[in-house]
Swiss-Prot record:
Primary location group: cytoplasm
Gene coding for it: grpE1
Chain residue ranges for the region called Disordered: 1-22
Protein name: Protein GrpE 1
Source organism of this protein record: Buchnera aphidicola subsp. Acyrthosiphon pisum (strain APS) (Acyrthosiphon pisum symbiotic bacterium)
Transmembrane segments: none
Highest taxon listed in the record's lineage: Bacteria
Length: 194
């Protein structure tokens, strides 16, 4: 009997409910869900695009860092000899001075000719060393003075030579790999007499 009463009560409730109201509620819930899904899909797409952009930026930065690192390594290797060569330059200068002294004095004694041969041999080895490691000697005369590779030590006033020419090289200069000045050449520069 109780069971019957419950069934009757349920039927009454169903009859009293308006199906349009129930349907509207369902439609509204569906609309909210659809809107939420669309919103979440848009956010997901935007997030994916941002992630892709950031990945591209990170990849570019990694390539830049890699290239910069490789350039630094190349530069370090290329110019690793710089300090050693700079310290070695006074020794080279002294060998050249000794060679020039013996040649200018023109000593004919056997011991001096033997020293001269050995000094010339050392100079030839140094030239090969310079060539091997791309070191250029700056010792040209009758060229225009270039302040980036020459240091003027004196001025020679004359009308025989064009002004601003290298007349004499007092001390050779050196360039490493055509770009790094190890030491400027100490030179005498010509200037017109007034």
């Amino acid at each position: 009997m109780i069971h019957n009463e419950e069934e009757q009560l349920e039927k009454k409730i169903e009859k009293n409910q308006d199906p349009k109201i129930n349907h509207k509620k369902y439609d509204s819930d569906n609309l909210i869900k659809k809107n939420l899904i669309q919103f979440l899909e848009i956010q997901l797409k935007e997030s994916e695009e941002k992630i892709i952009e950031k990945e591209e930026i990170v990849e570019k930065e990694i390539v830049l860092i890699h290239n910069r690192f490789n350039k630094e390594i190349e530069k370090s290797i290329k110019f690793s000899l710089e300090k050693i060569i700079i310290d070695f330059l006074p020794i080279i200068d002294n060998i050249e001075r000794a060679l020039n002294l013996i040649e200018t004095i023109n000593l004919k004694q056997e011991k001096y000719t033997e020293i001269l041969k050995k000094l010339q041999f050392i100079c030839n080895l140094l030239e090969k060393f310079f060539y091997l490691f791309n070191i250029k000697k700056i010792n040209d005369t009758n060229v225009l003075f270039n302040p980036s590779i020459h240091q003027a030590m004196s001025i020679h006033y004359t009308n025989d030579i064009i002004s601003n020419q290298i007349v004499t090289v007092m001390q050779s200069g050196y360039i490493l790999h055509k770009s790094r000045l190890l030491r400027p050449a100490m030179v005498v520069v010509s200037k017109e007499k007034i």
